[in-house]
From Swiss-Prot:
Name of the molecule in the record: Hsp70 nucleotide exchange factor fes1
Coiled-coil ranges (or none): none
Record's keyword annotation contains Flavoprotein: no
Gene3D superfamilies per the UniProt record, alphabetical: Leucine-rich Repeat Variant
Function recorded in the entry: Functions as a nucleotide exchange factor (NEF) for Hsp70 chaperones which accelerates the release of ADP. Required for fully efficient Hsp70-mediated folding of proteins.
Protein's UniProt keywords contain Repeat: yes
């Protein structure tokens, strides 16, 4: 701050005299950063360098990751991960011995690819989907595993190429179904909402999820999750909305009569999950 004030005073003095302005080469770069803002590309490089530096304490690495994640919230910065050659380095952090760094790496990846087709493609080109599923399989921390799952679903939403690629990644669908069967209130709900997102897309992704729904009995598993978490309105809401879309596409649970009975109970407890017309349409589709 003192340097910034001194520089401001110098400029003001120069403006009130006939002397030439100060030579730009003499200006302190830190002062210019205060005035104009640091270059995001440089900040991204510095953050990754700090994350990789073994001499940097863990808490400082976490701060560097937070900075990187905030930077890639801006789509241009996210897309600059390619020319800066940061994708391989970022993905490598999914193998860090520190669970915190693995979690922050997954979070940063999710932020970079979310609603960003260019970054989604860049992740694919860096073998990122395969790496993410490998991390999902090996991860033993639920908190970190949830962030890896978040990165996967962020990459695959509105991404036909990514969905089509899943059949080439060993056991990718099986891993998603395994999480669905866990009935974990957070991770399972994320998978269910991901399936819902695919069902509202009018593209090949929708056809693929309908095919997988038959193959893995997905509606049945979603229904069982709703029963397991029947007092949790958000879990029930996401489950029923997803089941409704499956039903509209003629993919249903094995026992529709049981689902009909459950709908009556859910409607009495959470009437605002659907509109009156939607409740009626769901009932009629099951009858």
């Amino acid at each position: 701050m003192e340097k910034l004030l001194a520089f401001s005073t110098q400029l003001q003095a120069q403006g009130n005299s006939s002397n030439s302005p100060p030579d730009p080469k003499d200006l302190d770069p830190s002062v210019l950063d205060h005035i104009f803002g640091a270059n995001p590309a440089d900040e991204m490089r510095k953050a990754m360098d700090a994350i990789e530096d073994p001499s940097v304490p863990l808490d400082q690495k976490e701060i560097a990751f937070d900075n990187l994640e905030m930077l890639v919230e801006h789509i241009d910065n996210a897309n600059n991960l390619v020319p800066l050659q940061l994708w391989p380095r970022l993905l490598k952090q999914l193998e860090s011995p520190e669970s915190t760094l693995r979690r922050l790496a997954a979070w940063t990846i999710a932020t970079a690819v979310q609603n960003n087709p260019k970054s989604q493609q860049a992740l694919i080109e860096n073998d990122g989907l395969k790496i993410l599923f490998g991390a999902l399989k090996k991860e033993d921390s639920d908190e970190t595993k949830n962030k890896v799952l978040y990165a996967i679903t962020s990459e695959l939403k509105l991404n036909e190429a990514g969905i089509a690629l899943l059949d080439k990644i060993p056991n990718s669908w099986e891993m998603l179904i395994e999480i669905l069967e866990l009935k974990h209130s957070v991770m399972t709900k994320r998978v269910i909402f991901f399936f819902y997102a695919l069902l509202i897309q009018e593209d090949k992704s929708k056809q693929i999820i309908l095919q997988k729904a038959h193959e893995f009995q997905i509606p049945e598993k979603v229904y069982q999750f709703s029963l397991e978490h029947s007092v949790d309105e958000d879990c029930v809401t996401k489950s029923l909305h997803t089941l409704y879309l499956f039903q509209k596409n003629k993919v249903s649970v094995a026992n529709t009569n049981e689902l009909l009975k459950s709908l009556v109970q859910f409607k009495s407890e959470f009437p605002e999950i659907f509109t009156v017309d939607e409740w009626k349409a769901f009932h009629e589709a099951l009858e």
